[in-house]
């Protein structure tokens, strides 16, 4: 049949030129736009500038597929099964992909699915676009669930910027889509069937945008890039979903699962789909999600809250379902929120009628209690009875939430009642005496000027003592709690004053007032005497440093200050003077039993350390030796005078060392012992080292000291840095130095003044 078709096309007359078809296509699109602008307001028009158009698809492949008999003298009948679209669009490659997917799914070959849809378009719709548009609308009618499965963000961009100008019911579709986006998830179930948006409404917007982009060279929209990316994303998603089998039954059942008004219980939406415990259905796209999903995997909708029953609670961190007895989450160890515990408690006790009755009674008691307290003062115990006192303390504005009841327990209230009865009986018998005594004490207090605070304290103590006496009379085993006085652990003057006050309280009449005054005078005298003694001691201590400084200035030239200054004048703590060091060590002798002098035995071999004399190492007092030197020529300048090195024969070197040792300053009369040459201790080495260093005149003589006498640790001397680095050469260096010295002996001047012999 293909061969016959080719032969017929060869013998048939040629079709009209391409520009004629393009002109016809452009004229029809322009007529549709003009009709759309006249029928609807200008705001619903997608694009007003239609100066130039471009064909949506390549026209030659569409020529043999549509009824275009008006362009041919002979009609060619091509079956629908042989139709294979080959559309190419450079701007929207996803549109070509969608048409190929529809062709594979059989929407172009099924004429029954697209029949009756031609009436949706405006009259004069191009025949070249009719069949692809009908195939897209057929897909939208068969797959109504695609609207919920597409990206909501892309749909919002298309609805805000797109205009369905190709269809008669375009404004209605745009209205339904806008209402769908505004209503959200909660308003979908409340809308009527006529107001609900469908996939067909979305497809009308997509087709109008595709035709608009293909027919205009340059789009005048300000958000062209956002609009194009959203439409391409929607076309790609629809092309992929069109190849999948339809799931209309699943969609219908999932739409009905939330038909209950309260939303309790989940019905089985499909018999062949098994849902496990914890799985949930998305209320937006009706997609089934696993229990671990926090949001829907299709539309990114948040997981709905569970309908909790009883004391169960949901973890706020990991959304894990916990029982009421769980204090912490079993999955993430998160602590149970406080709101859930309150809700569970309210749900448990809300059905108890007895509890409700008691709460109502407590509220009434609380109102009566508050009114009585406001009228009777702050003493609630005397105002209220047990019947009027509320079980739960009411909360008032500005009061702490957790109020602790100050109400006494029943036992204490009974004891207080018996005390009051005993007190009233005693007061009736002694009313006259008490009245007379109170008048006398008031008059004395006014005369003597005693403070009212002491009287109030005495009254409180008398009342407490009466209560304790009455309680002891009722119960012999009762031991009252007597608090300690506030000044019990204070100083003695205060204790004596308190004793005087207590004696004054116990004695009635004028004699008690006189005794109180006497005790106060006595305590004041004792306090003033002790204060005087303390001031004298402080003055004596402050005078000691002054006397010590005066004595030191008088004995400024005395070398031994410790023996010259008596012990009584020397203070225990050295005073501080301006400009001196803060940490001053006292010169006072330590005569305690723990001193080192006391611990040292008398028959020990202790040898005290005696420092060298200050002029022991002075070179000026050393005996001068005659050294032969060559005088410099007198005609030369002073700057050109070069002192010749002294010439000393190497044979007399040992004799010179012996003379130095014999002529050295004697230490006779000091406590320094003669060192033992066989002693290899560090102290002996240090002692021998100091002796030899004092005798050395030339640095080259250090090599003559044997290694045994050289100390491993350099000794410390006064005025020398603590961290002394040894300048001793290694044995190899000493050998090299000695050979070099033998070849070319180096003689230096040992005279410290540099004047030489005169």
UniProtKB/Swiss-Prot annotation:
UniProt keyword annotation of Plastid present: yes
Region Disordered: start-end pairs: 410-470, 512-545, 572-606, 629-654, 727-758
Cellular component per GO, a single term: chloroplast stroma
Gene Ontology molecular function: mRNA binding; zinc ion binding
Protein's GO biological process: chloroplast mRNA modification; chloroplast organization; mRNA processing
Keywords linked to the UniProt accession: Chloroplast, Metal-binding, mRNA processing, Plastid, Repeat, Transit peptide, Zinc, Zinc-finger
Gene3D superfamilies the UniProt entry points to: Zinc finger, RanBP2-type (4.10.1060.10)
Compartments, record wording: Plastid, Chloroplast
Listed InterPro entries: Znf_RanBP2, Znf_RanBP2_sf
Chief location of this protein within or outside the cell: plastid
Compositional bias ranges of the Basic and acidic residues kind: 457-469, 519-545, 572-581
Sequence repeat segments: 368-415, 547-596, 688-736
Region ranges (3 X approximate repeat): 122-502
Gene null: resulting phenotype: Defects result in variegated plants that have leaves consisting of normal green and also white or yellow sectors in which chloroplast development is retarded or disrupted. Mutant plants exhibit severe editing defects in chloroplastic transcripts.
Quaternary structure and interacting proteins, as annotated: Interacts in vitro with the chloroplast-located protein CCD4/NCED4. Homodimer. Interacts with ORRM1. Interacts with PCMP-H51/CRR28 and PCMP-H12/OTP82. Interacts with ORRM6.
Function text: Probable component of some protein complex required for chloroplast and palisade cell development. Involved in C-to-U editing of chloroplastic RNA. Controls a large number of chloroplastic editing sites. Binds the editing recognition trans-factors PCMP-H51/CRR28 and PCMP-H12/OTP82.
Name of protein: Zinc finger protein VAR3, chloroplastic
Source organism of the structure: Arabidopsis thaliana (Mouse-ear cress)
Gene: VAR3
């Amino acid at each position: 049949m293909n061969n016959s078709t080719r032969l017929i096309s060869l013998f048939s007359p040629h079709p009209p030129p391409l520009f004629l078809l393009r002109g016809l296509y452009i004229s029809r699109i322009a007529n549709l736009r003009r009709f759309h602008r006249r029928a609807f307001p200008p705001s619903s028009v997608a694009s007003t500038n239609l100066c130039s158009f471009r064909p949506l698809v390549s026209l030659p492949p569409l020529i043999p597929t549509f009824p275009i008999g008006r362009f041919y003298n002979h009609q060619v009948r091509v079956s629908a099964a042989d139709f294979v679209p080959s559309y190419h669009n450079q701007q929207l490659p996803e549109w070509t992909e969608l048409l190929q997917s529809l062709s594979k799914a059989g929407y172009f070959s099924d004429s029954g699915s697209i029949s009756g849809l031609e009436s949706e378009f405006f009259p004069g719709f191009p025949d070249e676009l009719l069949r692809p548009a009908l195939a897209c609308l057929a897909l939208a009618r068969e797959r109504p669930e695609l609207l919920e499965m597409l990206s909501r963000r892309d749909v919002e961009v298309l609805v805000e910027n797109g205009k369905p100008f190709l269809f008669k019911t375009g404004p209605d579709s745009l209205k339904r889509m806008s209402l769908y986006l505004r209503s959200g998830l909660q308003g979908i179930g409340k809308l009527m069937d006529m107001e609900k948006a469908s996939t067909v409404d979305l497809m009308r917007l997509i087709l109008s945008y595709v035709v608009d982009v293909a027919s205009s060279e340059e789009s005048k929209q300000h958000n062209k890039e956002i609009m194009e990316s959203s439409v391409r994303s929607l076309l790609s998603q629809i092309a992929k979903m069109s190849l999948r089998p339809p799931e209309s039954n699943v969609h219908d059942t999932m739409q009905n699962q939330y038909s209950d008004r309260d939303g309790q219980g989940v019905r089985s939406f499909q018999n062949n789909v098994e849902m496990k415990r914890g799985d949930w259905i998305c209320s937006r796209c009706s997609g089934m999600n696993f229990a671990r999903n926090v949001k829907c995997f299709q539309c990114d909708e948040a997981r709905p809250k569970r309908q909790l029953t009883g004391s169960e609670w949901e973890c706020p961190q990991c959304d894990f379902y916990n029982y009421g007895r769980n204090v912490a989450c079993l999955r993430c160890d998160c602590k149970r929120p406080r709101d859930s515990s309150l809700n569970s408690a309210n749900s448990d006790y809300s059905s108890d009628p007895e509890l409700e009755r008691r709460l109502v009674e407590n509220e009434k008691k609380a109102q009566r209690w508050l009114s009585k307290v406001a009228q009777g003062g702050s003493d609630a115990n005397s105002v209220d009875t047990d019947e009027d006192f509320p079980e739960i303390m009411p909360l008032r504005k500005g009061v702490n939430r957790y109020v602790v009841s100050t109400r006494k327990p029943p036992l204490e209230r009974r004891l207080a009642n018996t005390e009051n009865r005993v007190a009233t009986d005693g007061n009736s018998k002694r009313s006259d005496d008490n009245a007379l005594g109170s008048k006398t004490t008031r008059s004395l207090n006014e005369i003597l000027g005693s403070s009212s605070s002491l009287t109030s304290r005495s009254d409180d103590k008398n009342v407490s003592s009466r209560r304790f006496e009455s309680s002891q009379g009722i119960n012999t085993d009762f031991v009252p709690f007597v608090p300690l006085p506030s000044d019990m652990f204070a100083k003695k003057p205060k204790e004596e004053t308190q004793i005087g006050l207590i004696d004054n309280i116990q004695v009635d009449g004028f004699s008690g007032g006189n005794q109180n005054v006497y005790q106060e005078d006595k305590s004041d005298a004792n306090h003033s005497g002790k204060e005087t003694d303390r001031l004298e001691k402080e003055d004596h201590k402050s005078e000691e440093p002054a006397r010590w400084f005066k004595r030191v200035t008088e004995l400024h030239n005395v070398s031994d200050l410790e023996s010259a200054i008596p012990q009584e004048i020397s203070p225990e703590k050295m005073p501080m003077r301006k400009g001196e060091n803060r940490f001053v060590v006292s010169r006072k002798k330590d005569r305690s039993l723990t001193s080192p002098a006391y611990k040292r035995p008398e028959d020990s071999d202790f040898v005290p350390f005696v420092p060298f004399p200050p002029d022991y190492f002075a070179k000026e007092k050393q005996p001068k030796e005659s050294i032969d030197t060559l005088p410099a020529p007198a005609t030369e300048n002073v700057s050109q005078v070069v002192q010749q090195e002294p010439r000393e024969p190497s044979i007399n070197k040992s004799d010179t060392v012996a003379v130095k040792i014999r002529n050295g300053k004697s230490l006779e009369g000091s406590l320094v012992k003669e060192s033992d040459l066989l002693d290899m201790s560090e102290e002996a080495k240090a002692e021998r080292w100091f002796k030899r260093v004092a005798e050395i005149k030339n640095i080259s003589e250090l090599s003559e000291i044997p290694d045994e006498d050289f100390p491993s640790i350099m000794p410390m001397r006064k005025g020398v840095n603590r961290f002394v680095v040894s300048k001793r050469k290694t044995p190899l260096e000493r050998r090299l130095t000695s050979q070099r010295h033998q070849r070319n002996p180096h003689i230096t001047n040992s005279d410290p003044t540099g004047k030489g012999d005169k």
